[in-house]
A protein has these predicted regions:
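Gram-negative outer-membrane beta-barrel transporters
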Residues: 420, 491, 605-609, 629-733, ...
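Membrane-embedded beta-barrel scaffold of Gram-negative outer-membrane proteins
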Residues: 270, 279, 364-390, 541-543, ...
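Short acidic/polar hinge/loop motifs at secondary-structure boundaries
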Residues: 197-225
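Surface-exposed extracellular loop regions of Gram-negative outer-membrane beta-barrel proteins
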Residues: 328-343, 443-450, 505-517, 528, ...
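Transmembrane beta-barrel wall of Gram-negative outer-membrane proteins
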Residues: 23, 253, 260-289, 294-330, ...
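Structural signature of Gram-negative outer-membrane beta-barrels, strongest in the C-terminal barrel
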Residues: 313, 429-434, 438-440, 472-609, ...
Length: 806
């Protein structure tokens, strides 16, 4: 009996000891900004409790197994309750708190000053994605002071280091940003997405973005640099993802915004959204028009969006989204250098038009197997077109009333991306596995020929088969598998290896014909490229660095030949028939965090290696190569693999909460921020002697933005100074401009913008002045639309916005 009793006691002690070893830990974060929340009270069954630390982390140990009621509360946030089942040794759980917005009529208190610092970072794990050790930025649009009616990129992206911005139109119809010496052309060096799915014309063959969501509808913009290539696609620039707003936690909320501005700018934006039961919905409609500050630059656009989410149960959620955008823009064409210096508001093209019709649909499924395992599947399609009409001859040649060139393009794409994320334990440290697959099918049709000789927006061919013209089909197919694994070595160090394998098919099939010396020539072209691409990456993060984080990342990149690189008819451009795909890698090394609760920083160095870089060489037609006799001895751009480049740079963002450093005043705040980028891009290999050792084009040495932001109760004001040093427009580093303005230096420029708003409960007023000092400058030399030639940026302009929330 004694032996049996002793055995019972031993077994009981073992069970009790096992029960006492359970640990419950996690992080408390803000649902709106993804910022960690300190001082949150975490309780289990009113028996166990703890307060989250300065990084939002909490841990409860010595817990017996069983079912618990988890309750989390924090001042300024809505309470959180959830039943959890504690059976495993260590249970990780992230708590997401919704802000508790109170409408105060008598007292105005700013509370936390994050509203001024509208930049934050992605958490290591967001939904079914891993961002640990990756350089990234998140722009919170609700706190961004900018001319949102025109999507003013200079203001919206003011706190993102190193971005080179093209300003091609004054109404924000197309976003054009680049980084680290990558061309800003329609943001084609980023993988551009909306709510996680593709929105560009063709993700591989034609990654240009003709659609940009209205700033008024965006909740936040997520930017992940080149290390995003493993999860989101192979682009050197990384990921640019627009997260649109969702319905508030109320049955119905209506927002109406009316904006008026210089050059007859008119913008109306209406949104409605809400939640009821298991349903959440959000819709908006925007219509805007503008005459432009140069002649022949009228434009009008409209955008509509609707989304609905259905939470079937605690595990399963469905979502459906539909987007439509269309616009018609008259384009005044480019200028040569002499005209820009003397009369930048001149236009030599009165018959150029551009038309876009963009349609996107997406269906999403989110399924939670348990607290550790989640699945996300996105199925999306795009049915869109873009058409260009006008005279694309050299800008230094005057118009003679000839027939206009017409370029039509249709894009029909369909794809699915499914990813699974799984949290697991290595010892007592939680690690995270992410695996995903992608299937993407694209089909693009491009036609080019002659239209009428009129001046209206008549997008119809005339005698297409009797004169010159072309018709090409561009099918593309992409199958990919990707894996990343976040391994936490301990509470401080994590390592994230990963890889991606893509099967890529791009091809074209079609013909073009032209009249040469009164004879009609037909040429059939067909080309097919099929290849497999393997990319690898590795990231390391150290989070016990004085309240901050040290991070490092290496990731390979790849860029497939663009459809435009395969075939184009443009007297300004000639395509090398032996083009090859581009490849390379990004390296980031940096420090980021918050010091003393008032100084936010992200300091990093990067290295970009770019092989087989496609660019332009300057050349001249001779009697054999000239497409027309009049073209002999005129210059053109040859698109070819010009060589290998490397870019090394320093990117930094620092924001100082001045008043919080010296006082405890809660009714006002003053922030100063400095965003700088110093970089040097050089061609280190080239078969062209005129290229080797040259600077990379569209890669300014210095890119700086300095801002002041002041807030007093409901009033906020912001002053922004932007400076970009001189840069080259071609790889041959042409300084003296050519007559057609395609080649030459882009001089340095500086711009000042001022914005202010008064936000009082349901009523809001926004005012501002862009290009406050009325500088005359330009950011690009265009080879085709909207040029060719120099595209002058807007002169000083004003805006006023009134908003009503119901």
């Amino acid at each position: 009996m004694l032996g049996l009793r002793s055995l019972y006691i031993i077994l009981f002690c073992c069970v009790f000891t096992a029960q006492a070893q359970h640990v419950f830990k996690g992080t408390v974060v803000d649902a709106l900004s993804s910022v960690s929340i300190p001082n949150a009270h975490v309780k289990l069954n009113d028996s166990y409790g703890v307060v989250s630390d300065e990084n939002g982390r909490f841990e409860l140990s010595g817990l017996p197994s069983g079912t618990y009621l988890l309750e989390v509360s924090c001042v300024g946030f809505k309470g959180f309750k959830k039943q959890i089942n504690l059976t495993k040794k260590v249970l990780y759980f992230d708590v997401v708190l919704q802000p508790d917005i109170l409408e105060l009529s008598q007292v105005d208190v700013l509370g936390q000053n994050e509203r001024l610092t509208n930049i934050t970072r992605l958490r290591s794990i967001e939904g079914t994605a891993i961002y640990a050790s990756k350089k990234n930025e998140v722009i919170l649009m609700e706190s961004t002071l900018a001319n949102k009616a025109t999507n003013n990129s200079r203001q919206v992206y003011a706190k993102v280091p190193g971005l080179n911005i093209w300003e091609s139109d004054g109404m924000g119809l197309q976003l054009e940003i680049g980084a680290r010496g990558l061309s800003p052309h329609r943001t084609s060096n980023f993988n551009t997405r909306q709510n996680g799915y593709d929105i560009s014309a063709d993700a591989l063959g034609y990654p240009e973005s003709y659609y940009t969501p209205p700033s008024e509808a965006i909740q936040k913009i997520e930017i992940v640099r080149g290390a995003a290539s493993l999860q989101y696609g192979t682009q050197f620039g990384g990921l640019l993802n627009f997260r649109l707003k969702k319905g508030e936690n109320k049955p119905l909320e209506i927002i109406v915004r009316q904006t008026l501005g210089s050059f007859k700018l008119q913008n109306i934006f209406v949104s409605l959204g809400g939640s009821k039961g298991k349903w959440n919905y959000y819709s908006f409609y925007q219509k805007k028009s503008r005459n432009g500050w140069r002649p022949n630059s009228n434009s009008e656009a409209q955008t509509a969006f609707s989304s609905v989410q259905y939470q079937a149960n605690d595990r399963l959620e469905f979502g459906l989204e539909i987007t439509h955008m269309d616009y018609l823009a008259q384009q005044p064409g480019g200028l040569d250098d002499a005209t820009f210096l003397s009369n930048p508001d001149t236009s030599f093209r009165a018959r150029n038009w551009f038309r876009v019709n963009w349609n996107i649909a997406a269906f999403t499924v989110d399924y939670k197997f348990n607290e550790r395992t989640k699945l996300n599947s996105r199925t999306f399609g795009l049915w869109s077109s873009r058409d260009g009409l006008g005279v694309l001859d050299r800008i230094d040649w005057s118009e003679s009333g000839q027939q206009r060139d017409l370029l039509l393009a249709e894009f029909n794409n369909f794809g699915n991306e499914t990813r699974l994320i799984r949290r697991y334990l290595i010892g007592e440290s939680e690690s995270v596995f992410l695996g995903g697959v992608r299937w993407y099918r694209g089909f693009t049709v491009k036609e080019q020929g002659l239209a009428d000789s009129g001046s209206n927006a008549n997008f119809s061919f005339e005698n297409k088969l009797d004169h010159y013209g072309s018709y090409f089909e561009f099918p593309s197919l992409n199958k990919a598998v990707f894996v990343e694994n976040l391994v936490r070595v301990n509470d401080c160090i994590s390592i994230t290896p990963g890889f991606r394998y893509d099967q890529i098919l791009t091809e074209f099939d079609g013909f073009f014909h032209a009249v040469v010396n009164d004879s009609l020539y037909y040429t059939n072209n067909r080309k097919k490229l099929e290849r497999g691409i393997f990319l690898a990456g590795l990231g390391v993060s150290y989070k016990c660095f004085l309240g901050g984080e040290a991070y490092a990342n290496f990731s390979q990149n790849y860029r497939a030949i663009n459809f435009n690189d395969m075939q184009v008819i443009n007297s300004n451009i000639v395509i090398d028939p032996d083009l090859e795909d581009e490849k390379g890698f990004n390296i980031d090394l940096g420090l980021r965090g918050m010091a003393w609760g008032v100084l936010e920083y992200d300091l990093s160095v990067f290295y970009l290696n770019y092989s087989n870089r496609i660019g332009y060489l300057s050349d001249y037609y001779d009697s054999v190569s000239a497409p027309e006799p009049d073209d002999i001895y005129t210059s053109y751009r040859l698109s070819t693999n010009i060589g290998d480049s490397k870019t090394l740079g320093v990117e930094s963002y620092v924001s100082w909460n001045v008043l919080k450093s010296f006082t405890d005043i809660e009714t006002q705040a003053l922030n100063i921020f400095l965003n700088t980028s110093f970089q040097k891009g050089t061609y280190v290999r080239s078969d062209e002697p005129s290229i080797l050792g040259n600077r990379v084009e569209y890669n300014p040495d210095v890119n700086l933005k300095f801002g002041l932001q002041y807030q007093y109760k409901s009033f906020t004001s912001s002053l922004l100074y932007s400076y970009t040093s001189s840069q080259f427009a071609d790889a041959q580093n042409t300084i003296s401009p050519t007559q057609n303005a395609l080649f030459g230096e882009i001089p340095s420029y500086s711009v000042v913008d001022w914005s202010a708003k008064y936000d009082k409960e349901k009523f809001l007023i926004e005012v501002g002045v862009n290009n406050l000092l009325d500088r005359s400058y330009f950011t690009r030399r265009a080879t085709g639309y909207p040029g060719p030639g120099i595209i002058p940026s807007d002169k000083r302009n004003y805006y006023l916005c009134l908003q009503l929330k119901i």
